[in-house]
Amino acid sequence: MACKSAGTRIRSDYMDYKSIRRTLHMGESTERPQDRAEREYRARIEGWSTFRSGVTLRGHEVFVVNFRELAALLDTIREQDTVVTSLWNSLPREVKHAYLNDLIGTEMLSTNGIEGVRSTRKEISDALQAARTNDSGKRFSEFAKLFLTLGDDDDKVPDIPGTLEDIRRIYDQVTAGELKDDDMPDGDLFRKGPVFIDDTATGRRIHTGIEPESEIKVALTQWLALAKDKSIPPLIRAAMCHFAFEYIHPFYDGNGRT
């Protein structure tokens, strides 16, 4: 069993879209809350603008409603991506590498901080250098190597995990030498015991990961199919994959890094 703490949550109430939970508090219906929630869920997941993930978590499929503000935001991101790509391609290779090193270093520090792993700028810098020279002896070098693969400016696209074993392999890479003994996966590939996430400010339990391991494997098999589903726009697919993976929480520790 493991218990994790949650950091600050991103607010999403600046948009007109209302969550199902919020919708329940807005009406004065005498219908049972569970029945109203289920009816609202069915209406949304079967809507014309809904992208369905195929990932079922505790009896309900993960979905995204492509509402007006989200569609506009995605268009803005695509436009900005074109501008950024043009500017990026105009930079000398040395400048690109220097910028990527700084960007990846900052991201690794942030990710480690969220995961509760202590790291310094010097350690991250050494890890990036080791990753570029295939020196696996440095702390975080395997983690850095994965980030560098994502940032390479060649045309090679990093392979998306295709099997449950691939997920475990990536996990082993990014957590190498950083896990406590009682945080090591104790199942076939993933954890076999429960894991909890608590709010650090209130101590309130806000999430329990999927269990047992057999159910984790079922959910992650669906997740692998979602990751390769080209019928869903890439940004929406990435958001659904991120949510579903963290919800499943297949490991006691290191889920965010994976």
What role is predicted for each listed range?
Residues 1-258:
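FIC/Doc superfamily catalytic core
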